[in-house]
Amino acid sequence: MVLRLLWRDPFWNGKRKPFGIGILMSGIMVILLFLTMMSYMYGVLFKSGYRAHNLNILAVDYDGGIIGEALSVAYEQFHGDEFPELQFHTPAKYPSIVEVQKAVCRGDYWGAIVTQPGASNRLSQALRGGSAAGTYNSSDSLTYINNGARYPAVQLGDISGNLETLIGAVSSVYHALNGSQALSSLNASNENAVLAFLNPIKASHIDIKPTEQGTRVLFNTVSVVLPIIQQFFFLMAFNGINNQFGIYGRLNSTRIGLMRLFTSIVYTLLASLATTGYIWAFRESWNVNGGQFALLWMSYWIYMHINFLILDAATAFIPVSFLTFFVLPWAIINVAATIYPFELSPGFYRWAYALPSHEFYSLAIQVESGCGDVLYRALPILFSWEVVGLALAITGSSYRNRHAEAELIAVGKVQQSASKSDNNTLYDDERELITMNRLSPVQ
């Protein structure tokens, strides 16, 4: 029958208070940990709408007429903290729309809007009727450019959405600035001319890398944090298997270190292949090729291997009961570094340029879109993490092995001492029996 101890049982004497304090303190520590981490995470997005002006938009007036003027005046209506900042430059600096597109692709600007050459003249001729009215296309007035692969959610809401709002206002401003003159020259008997007057200005759109699949919202969130959790789960299983088979303490540290290094390389290679595979499997109509698959695979590989090394070192030095206080913050600060662009977050968060997740995601954007040269920054930072992680993992493996070896030696000494004690006891018993036999009378 199983003995069930009541709270008032003597078993609890001297244990009630420490037991209760232990549970209470653990609960408080975990609550404070999550409070701190979620405050950090929420801080990334706190009042981000009021930082939209940090998103710079290149504006170039190739028209030089009333439509270019209408664009400038319309922007003044929206100019403020909650609207991206248009930075106007002359055609001399950006001689063609191709140069504007290259500037957006390089990452110099989050987007661009330009007036098409001769747009005002084409509209003026269309209002007079004739063949010009029949061939007039209001979408040839303005063009806006963006890179849909660079933080897709931000591109959809803050860039494309705001630019389309601005473009809608340009038409109203045009009528306010030039409506009377346009009406005086309007050929009211020509249907196409009237349509040109009613809808004078629209915009064409150039998306450098359309990224419209539903899974795009996971690229800089779930697909950044899950590789960290994945390495942690595997390491817990890997360390458990090593302990079960008594590997530590019985092999020299060099062999164990090489075994763990080989395992980390092979496992992260396969894990990164699987991750890239499911991204490709759900890409829908996303226009990417095999070369980009391979480069993204390699990007995930180095990112996962860095996390493997960091967590391997952590599991070596930090007791299992306290690992939560390292793994959770490590995961949160890394995903917070990619969930939103730094332009929309408080300046404090820019320290996360140094984190592997941010450089990995920057590298992934370059691979996916072919834009934004970040290799000069991303590769040195990722390589530094790889070197530091490898050094920590080697140190941790050596520490783990020495600690296990010391435990084996201590256990051996205890067993040896117990064996000697048993032998001495047996020897004493034998001597006592012999003495008793000698003293007993012969029958």
What are these regions (language model features)?
Residues 42, 213-236, 245-428, 443:
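Membrane-spanning alpha-helical segments of multipass transporters and channels
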Residues 141, 204, 239-251:
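Hydrophobic transmembrane alpha-helix segments characteristic of membrane transport
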Residues 47-49, 82, 95, 241, ...:
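Residue-level detector of solvent-exposed, low-hydrophobicity positions
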